[in-house]
Amino acid sequence: MRGPGVGSGLSGERGLSGKEAGADTEVAELLPFLVPGARADLQAAAAQHVLALTGVGSGRTLLAGQTALLRALIDLAVAPIPAPSRDASRALVNLAADPDLHWQMLAADPELPVRLLRCVLDPQWPWAEELAAVLANLSREPAPCAVLTEKLVAAEPERLGLERLVSALCMPSYNASAPLHYLGPLLSNLSQQAEVRAFLLDPDRCVVQRLLPLTQYTDSSVRRGGVVGTLRNCCFEHRHHKWLLGPQVDILPFLLLPLAGPEEFSEEEMEELPVDLQYLSPDKQREPDADIRKMLIEAIMLLTATAPGRKQVRDQGAYLILRELYAWESEPDVRMACEKLIQVLIGDEPEVGMENLLEVQVPEDVERQLQELDQQEQQELAQERRDKGAPRT
């Protein structure tokens, strides 16, 4: 395969080897053109070729385990213009989208997370969005996510860690050349780690309060979904529920508002709702992304894990919003999640000693039965989705 627009090949004497060539030959031909000091036009063509390879599974397999080439690609991605850092960055996005390559990328450069984050958090870096996507992809799997978290926590004293990441996420104008929407899913993935949740839920930092307005961020479902996923993960920490639901944070209206539609309520019902959910305009739209709607419901469900949480969610009229959502919802799995939450809100309280649903010890035989029921439910939902998409006869 020849580099795009290079005529007879990168070296001027021989062309790039084809996909069918062995990995050793491929790396031998590509690597000299990717390293610093290579001629600019040949370096650009080599980066384009690697980008093309990363677009298909066979190409990613070809590159897998080639430590020197991966390291050169990483160096190129963080190199200043005029280096072809954009193509190198996009190649890293594709590589990081393959979970099987995460460890190879981290092995090629153990400092990869910090190096990429340094560019992502540079307000002048033109390809910061691509590198944010690399970090978001890398952090999807638990083990690489833990490694990434360790690096970010270690970088915190230099303000290259979580605090600066949150600041950039909460400031859409942070980088005029890059929207940084992928900081949303990056933070969501990182918040699977206990250390990150502890940072986010630190009352002295006011991080959660800064994230809440982004549940209504209309310019990007990627950013919005990442923030909602982060908030949902924070809701697993039931010891913070009182603070989250209390006046210092007041999280519930921010979770309910995207689920609310234009439906009218009686005056009596209206008084049950938080002020922000009263008298909504007739053109009020619900969250358009089904996955985000489900995460919002899941976050509220987690807040009902304790008896005080259930009471506060009930007292703020959540049932009214969910009742109308259930009547409107067409996605089977979201509708099922909504139904389960409604059942918690209208059902009887658990018996003494079982008030905290996150701490209840479930016997193994009951757990197996629940897993079987869950599998059956998932099969029914899958069938419902298939039936929904089937052409009419």
From Swiss-Prot:
Pfam family, one: DUF383
Top-level lineage group: Eukaryota
Chain positions covered by the region annotation Disordered: 1-21, 374-393
Modified residues (Phosphoserine): S221
Basic and acidic residues bias locations: 382-393
Keyword Phosphoprotein: yes
UniProtKB keywords: Phosphoprotein
Biased composition (Gly residues): 1-12
Matching InterPro entries: ARM-like, ARM-type_fold, Hgh1, Protein_HGH1_C, Protein_HGH1_N
Record family assignment: Belongs to the HGH1 family.
Name of protein: Protein HGH1 homolog
Organism encoding this protein: Rattus norvegicus
Lineage of source species: Eukaryota, Metazoa, Chordata, Craniata, Vertebrata
